[in-house]
Amino acid sequence: MGPVFYSGGWNRWQLEGDSMASLDTVRARFARNEGLPFADILTEASIRDVLNEHGFTYRDRVFSPVTTIWGFLSQVLSEDHSCRDAVSRIIAHRAANGHAVCSPNTASYCNARSRLLTSVLSTLATQTAEELQTSVDRQWKWNGRSVFIVDGSSVSMPDTPENQQMYPQVPQQATGLGFPLARITVLLSLATGACHDLAIASYQGKGTGEKSLFRRMYDTLKSGDVVVADALFDDYFIVWELYKRNIDIVARAQYERVGSRISETSSEGDIIVWQRPNKPRGMTGAQYRSYPKSLVMRQVTVDARDKNNRVQQFKVVTTILNVSIDGTQIGDLFERRWEGEVDIRSIKSTMQMDILRCKTPDMVHKEIWTHLLAYNLLRTVMAVAADENDIEPRKVSFKGAKQALTAFAPKIEAAQPENRAPLIDALLTTIAYHRVGNRPGRWEPRARKRRPKHAARLTQPRHISKLPHNRSKWF
């Protein structure tokens, strides 16, 4: 297909169908010259297994589900992001391998994308992240435990009636002048950066907040995991819901924490008793009484520097009461929450998911999960490169890895199988070379230096602005 992924016909990727047990497995596949990293990690066999698991039936045609998924991945990874570019990649791949060339018309490809199940794409994305998490070195984890960062953001999409109905624009915008807006909450691995789950809702309304979306992802977490979050998630009810699942939380304490008192003072953090707050609206009396009347937590003071380089202190609370983990470790762990912000930037800016292209909610969901699948696949390649060079995956630049893969992929595909090993070694070395620095307490002003070019803003819908009697306003 496109130069980003393929090196030969699909039969080449028929493997035993076992899940990737370790990074050594991926490295061994590279050594056998079986092709590019993505095709080795996401094999045709594994895609077909997920399709069968979801009862997806299909015919053998040019745009089969496997071909369509790879084309969709190629599309979200390219700078162009257009369907025409994806179809051109498919045509180039077929021509290079002696197959009949299909029509350049994008209709068949778009129809094939619409036939894909969102559940298939989400399963592939989460499965890739989970396989990577289980394969990572123990030293990459925090005290041997898996840590996940939860955070929220928003994405916009084309202004169509279907999108507006499910994800309406903010009410302050006039009809025809705004764009549908959705809120997303993601669960990211601190060790690998992979995205393990995502929940989406309209930007405003009941049950659309980040805390409500986070509750949908509880089942993704396992007993013994640790969640790192900002002050929004310093919530009595969320803390208890996680505690019941044997999941610890580390969060910044809210400025006005009602109902808590210090019961024990220590250099490693104060032990506080948090009294159950008043019943929230929307919670029944029976549900409210199911929560305990108090919780015991640990509060740690963290030193940080503000934008003026002055030391300021803030409080971090956690359910980790084990004294063998000192307060400094808790504070250092919370400061790494910033890496989740950088991951979201990588997904939205580097992979261009901040403004989606699809015109219906169903296709928007598929586009989002395909972005996350591509993101997790690239994170897996980064983990292999990091393991080869004895560094942590978090030290590898995501954008540098994406640039290296884009540069090397066409050369690896064009090379003979016996000549691919040196190219793959060079790819992994190049990915590991581009690293990010250790930047604790990093602070950047949310402002731009370069001024955008002046352009008048639409004050009425475009189809009205284009009418003859309105043209004089724009020229």
Regions found by a protein language model. Name each.
Residues 91-99:
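Extended, structured, electrostatic nucleic-acid-contact surfaces
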Residues 1-89, 113-116, 123-131, 142-146, ...:
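Single, function-defining residue in the core of a domain
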Residues 99-118:
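Major-groove recognition helix of helix-turn-helix-like DNA-binding domains
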Residues 139:
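Noncatalytic carbohydrate-binding groove/subsite architecture in carbohydrate-active enzymes
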Residues 168:
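Extracytoplasmic c-type cytochrome modules immediately beyond a signal peptide or single-pass transmembrane anchor
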